Amino acid sequence: MKSRKLLLAILALGLLTTSCYTEVIIDDDFIVESPVNTDQVLQSFDLWYVDINASSADGAVPFLQRAFTVSFDRGVVLANNNIVGIGKTGNGLGIDVGSYATLNGVVEIDHDFDGLWALEVYAVNNTTIELFDPRSRSSYVLRGYQRSNFDYDLVFYDNIDYFLEEYEAWEKTFTSEVGAVNEFDNENFLQFVGGSATFRSSVDAVRTPLVNVQWDYQGTYELFDVANDATLKTLTLDYDFLGNDYFELYVINDSTIELYHVASETVYEFTGRGFIQFAKAEVNTGKMRKKSTRKTMPVTRKRKM
């Protein structure tokens, strides 16, 4: 059984922070639960960040497993399912993925493709709730934020591996004149396969249509955090039977990255091709977030900016 009190007005959970909500009076630690209170709690924050690392679920509720944030807005459920465009899509709230209604301490969500779910709502603290699925006995931890204080950039860099997977391929669009000649000069397309640590690369000519790209190499890749440098990531491409390449990864915008090849001191720019929107379509349900296991690399930035 859950040890936390079911909803219990969630300690008012910020309901007093906005004037458009009715004040909830707490008498000691008991509140008469009602659908109105449940809805007020869900709407008390603009966004709920789905903290996968703190959740005890592994794909049990698909639409929560794939979402970075969810929002509850007057009967409509919105979600940010993509890192590309996060903070911009739907004025920061994401896309419409279904509808919801509230019962006593329960939210019924009718997802456009995942169907109907009745999830129990539990209070963790003033800014955190837990959605519990009694069928699978799994839970998702949601942390509440207003748009004005939500750090979209932090979420972006914390989930940058999903960003790489949100394009069908990355096409090389620039190579610096500075830098030693190396074999990576010949590789013009990269693909990071969703749901795995697999990458593929191609030496096909730039501007080759994606449907015609032939993948010449493949292997495994790994992203690393860098101590004391939140926006710098390092990337290792480990080719099957062919050694590896090591890069510093820089994000220019939602569709452009730079790879700094440390060994040769060459800068490559890649542009994303074929954006994959993890929206509402059944074909996209394969994308699921996992608990982060990314390691921290004890290195310093090598590129001279």
For the regions a protein language model found, what residue spans apply to each?
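Long, hydrophobic/aromatic-enriched structural stretches that serve as scaffold segments
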Residues: 4, 102-105
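C-terminal motif of bacterial Sec signal peptides marking the signal peptidase cleavage site
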Residues: 16-19
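Positively charged n-region of N-terminal signal peptides that target proteins for export
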Residues: 1-5, 22
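Lipid interaction determinants
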Residues: 21-97, 104-220, 224-305
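Sec-dependent N-terminal signal peptides
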Residues: 6-12
